[in-house]
Amino acid sequence: MANTTGRIPLWLIGTVVGTPVISLVGIFSYGSYSGLGSSL
């Protein structure tokens, strides 16, 4: 595997991008489960 991302490792990009996405999905899922998103 060639490092084509320059000085930024791919796992770091995945962590930075993935963490807020997982948090957002978790909050939405919890909201739907607790009844806040039942109107959707």
From Swiss-Prot:
One Pfam family it belongs to: PsbJ
Keyword rRNA-binding: no
Membrane topology: Single-pass membrane protein
Bilayer-spanning residue ranges: 8-28
Disulfide bonds: none
Principal location listed in the UniProt entry: plastid
Matches recorded under InterPro entries: PSII_PsbJ (IPR002682), PSII_PsbJ_sf (IPR037267)
Keywords: Chloroplast, Membrane, Photosynthesis, Photosystem II, Plastid, Reaction center, Thylakoid, Transmembrane, Transmembrane helix
GO process annotations (BP): photosynthesis
GO cellular component terms, semicolon-separated: chloroplast thylakoid membrane; photosystem II reaction center
Subcellular localization: Plastid, Chloroplast thylakoid membrane
Family, as annotated: Belongs to the PsbJ family.
Assembly, per entry: PSII is composed of 1 copy each of membrane proteins PsbA, PsbB, PsbC, PsbD, PsbE, PsbF, PsbH, PsbI, PsbJ, PsbK, PsbL, PsbM, PsbT, PsbX, PsbY, PsbZ, Psb30/Ycf12, at least 3 peripheral proteins of the oxygen-evolving complex and a large number of cofactors. It forms dimeric complexes.
Function: One of the components of the core complex of photosystem II (PSII). PSII is a light-driven water:plastoquinone oxidoreductase that uses light energy to abstract electrons from H(2)O, generating O(2) and a proton gradient subsequently used for ATP formation. It consists of a core antenna complex that captures photons, and an electron transfer chain that converts photonic excitation into a charge separation.
Protein name: Photosystem II reaction center protein J
Name of the gene this protein is made from: psbJ
